[in-house]
């Protein structure tokens, strides 16, 4: 059975490439008979053209690259979410969807010309070998990784169980240590955090939807139940989506048996329904779903399924607006196409897919329009189409046509400075500054107990000033320290926490100064008292 994906994901030779792509697709799926005689002639003609270029053109031509460009051009003219996966990308994409890969288990960035370890995966090969955040990897089996044109992580990849020796430079040392590491299966975590926000309210942060997400999410639910959770909040902010079934499994945790969660329609208008089962652990308890403008596809499936069944409360800002379903099909040479094969609809019958008539660039940059029209600050600025109005079984008004509008609106960061700092919180900028600190004067933190770090560690002024100076680079000259000091300190401490103790602690710390989390707690208390 082919997997279906809901994923938030660019004209050279369009004419002849169309024939090649269609020919490959139909051949892969055993549908060559669908071609008319004329179609077969065109396909052979186009394939012949590629052969002639390959054999007779005056210069050497990489016809594989021509085909790749052509296929990309074709798919760009279909919809924003139909994509081509080249043979070079195929393994990484497969790993991402599956939720694991073979490697040494590190998060890293290239610092100047050297691989610097941000953190190690818990119980992974590198952690077991004694590698820590702040370490720099200089060699693999004696071959240098540093220097011009030398930095490539390909040498770190290999088969599971194979062994390599890393040359590692630790903070404060001048000796390069030779550390043997055995490659292994590394889980790509979907659940960043699962902990109790209050005595009653459990919290789960989910960053993606992969094949492994269901098992991770179920474990998180079990942890919270054992800790006494009577309510649960699922944070899907900035979650771009992924595997459809994982989203349906998540929604099933909160919906009763036989409740419609979603339906799909293909090109022939054939309908496929997805219903909840009786397996949910929180069917009779309050649930909250957190979304924002970057919550897409599978995240929207969950939010839409619950909202249309009058289950729980959706908190945040209007979601991205993707209602297309992709199916991955192999093209026979290791490459694949992830093609839109259906539209999905929430239980009330609404499509939340945004229009894409103006092209892919405008489609993916639509958030700029949301910013300019004030939607991110005021719910009343959200444009709705009354012809796309629907009612839930309880009579609540919901809209199709572009994302899930939350039940409870929480404004985004206001003003340039707050938006810049929010961007820093969601990207790796602060991580790099913190990692440099760990390699130098902060190396002692690598041995500090987590409780001591949480309870008593304060970010030094020198680190704050270094972050501030680097943050003001580029287009951020107007960024001020006054009024932002407390959040900058928290952001740096959270980045250090992730590199030292794991992502969950980073999430916990950032949540202490998060307006949406504050509003969530208010709603939780109100629900408890009713």
Tell me the role of every PLM-derived stretch.
Residues 55-116, 161-165, 169-193, 510-521, ...:
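Extended, small/polar residue-biased N-terminal targeting/export presequences
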Residues 29-42, 46, 50, 54, ...:
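Cleft-lining beta-strand/loop regions that shape enzyme active-site pockets
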Residues 8-24:
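Hydrophobic membrane-insertion alpha-helices, especially the h-region
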Residues 351-352, 356-530:
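Conserved functional hotspot residues or short segments at active or partner-binding sites
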Residues 1-5:
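Positively charged n-region of N-terminal signal peptides that target proteins for export
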Residues 298, 310, 317, 321-388:
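Polar, glycine-rich mid-to-C-terminal structural blocks
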